[in-house]
C-alpha cells in the first residue's frame, strides 16, 4: 500500500513524518513529482495556514486552495486524508461534525478551506477530513502559544510598522517588505532578538496584540 504525504515540511506534516513512515514526501518544491502516481493513500497537509494573510488577501488565498485542488486531482490518489481546520465553523464553541456550516458567514480563511473540503467530499466520498484546533508541538510557527513564547510579531502590517519604526530604530531595521502589505521580521541573531523583545514590550505592542476575529482569546 503506497502512502504519501503532501506538506511534509509544515508543522503538521513534519510531525506526521516523525510518527509515520511514508513512501514519498512532497511539498511545493517537488509536488510535480507526485502527479500521476495514484497512491493508495494521500495525506494532504499542504495548505498554507496563515490566517491573518488569508483574511487580508482573500483572492490570493483562494488561489492557493484552487492550486491544492489541482494538486490532488493530478496526483489522483485512491483515498485521501485532508488536514483541515475548525476555522470552517461559523463559531468557535458548541460545534461538532454535524454542525451546519454557512460559508457566507465565514471569514475568507474558513470559507476557502471549506471550499476545499467540499471538493474532497464530492470527489472522494470515503475521504477523512481532520479539522484541527489550535495545536502545539515541535516546529510550531504560529498561534497564541508561539506568540506567548516569542512575543515578537513575525509579521507587521505596513501602517503598524510605520508607526512603530518612528519610535524605534531597532524595529525599523528588523523587518523587510514582503510585497503583500506586510513586513516580516528578518532578525536571526539571539542577542538582537532579545533586545527586540524588550523593545516591543516597552512600546506596549507584542504578538499577543493579535486575536482571532471570531473570539476573545489571543490567537491568530
Describe each region flagged by the PLM.
Residues 33-77, 86-94:
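NAD(P)H-binding glycine-rich loop region in Rossmannoid oxidoreductase-like domains
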Residues 88-112, 149-156, 165-168:
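Catalytic loop of short-chain dehydrogenase/reductase
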Residues 6, 44-45, 80-86, 130-132:
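SDR active-site strand-loop-helix element
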Residues 62-63, 93-130, 134:
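Catalytic helix-loop patch of NAD(P)-dependent Rossmann-fold dehydrogenases
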Residues 2-22:
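N-terminal Rossmann NAD(P)H-binding glycine-rich loop of SDR-like oxidoreductase domains
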Residues 119-217:
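NAD(P)-dependent short-chain dehydrogenase/reductase
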Residues 21-39:
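A short, well-structured beta->alpha microelement
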Residues 82-95, 135-139:
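Conserved catalytic-site region of short-chain dehydrogenase/reductase
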